[in-house]
A protein has these predicted regions:
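Bacterial Sec-dependent N-terminal signal peptides
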Residues: 1-24
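Early exported N-terminus immediately downstream of N-terminal targeting peptides
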Residues: 22-91, 95
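Alpha-helix boundary/capping residues
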Residues: 32, 99-102, 162-165
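Extracytoplasmic
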Residues: 35-38, 73-75, 102, 112-116, ...
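Surface-exposed flexible segments
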Residues: 87-102, 144-147
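Short Gly/Thr-rich strand-loop-strand
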Residues: 98-123, 170-176
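A short, solvent-exposed beta-edge/loop patch
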Residues: 120-155
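C-terminal partner/receptor-binding element of secreted or periplasmic proteins
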Residues: 149-178
Length: 178
């Protein structure tokens, strides 16, 4: 009985830790959601599913379009928060402090002329569950979070064949493990 209770508490603790991390990122978005200095975009899982289905259904034998449609259907949502009129460096630091280093792995880090750009992934069971891009400069800040269930090959294809925000920066850097 004690073992069952201990296992239940352990499972609940792990679940709450995952919820708390997602909640921290969501809180960051929510904190600035009503701030007029920011542009905000949310693309729902249903919209991604519809876009992927549209591509697959209209591929007409185009294998790349079929693959891309299936891949876009794997995206469970995209959140974007950006501004050109804020202290991007302090927001970058604040956003980075919300990401638990033991849950997110750094994929790419670029420091250039007073600006910072970082791609981080959250991986579970061999699949990338979240790709996050955070950038901050003197007067600009961007945070992009893409949720889903991807492989590194999937991310490479998204970078090469779509105009999803932030993927152009991803394609300039790491292509992930081979």
């Amino acid at each position: 009985m004690k073992k069952i209770l201990l296992l239940a508490i352990l499972a609940l603790g792990i679940g709450l830790q995952a919820f708390a991390q997602e909640d921290a990122i969501q809180r960051f978005f929510s904190k600035y959601m009503e701030d007029e200095r920011f542009s905000r975009v949310y693309i729902s899982p249903k919209m991604m599913q519809m876009a992927g289905g549209f591509l697959k259904n209209n591929a007409e034998g185009d294998k790349d379009a079929e693959q891309l449609g299936a891949l876009i259907g794997k995206i469970k949502g995209i959140r974007i928060l950006s501004s050109e009129e804020v202290n991007g460096k302090s927001l970058y630091t604040e956003a980075m402090s919300t990401l638990s280093r033991n849950r997110y792995e750094e994929l790419m880090d670029v420091q250039d002329k007073g600006s910072s750009l970082k791609f981080m992934i959250r991986e579970e069971g061999g699949l990338i569950r979240e790709l996050t891009m955070i950038s901050g400069g003197e007067k600009s800040f961007s945070l992009i979070s893409m949720l889903g269930s991807f492989t590194y090959e999937d991310l490479n294809m998204l970078a090469e064949k779509t105009n999803i925000p932030g993927m152009d920066q991803y394609s300039k850097g790491s292509k992930g493990p081979k």
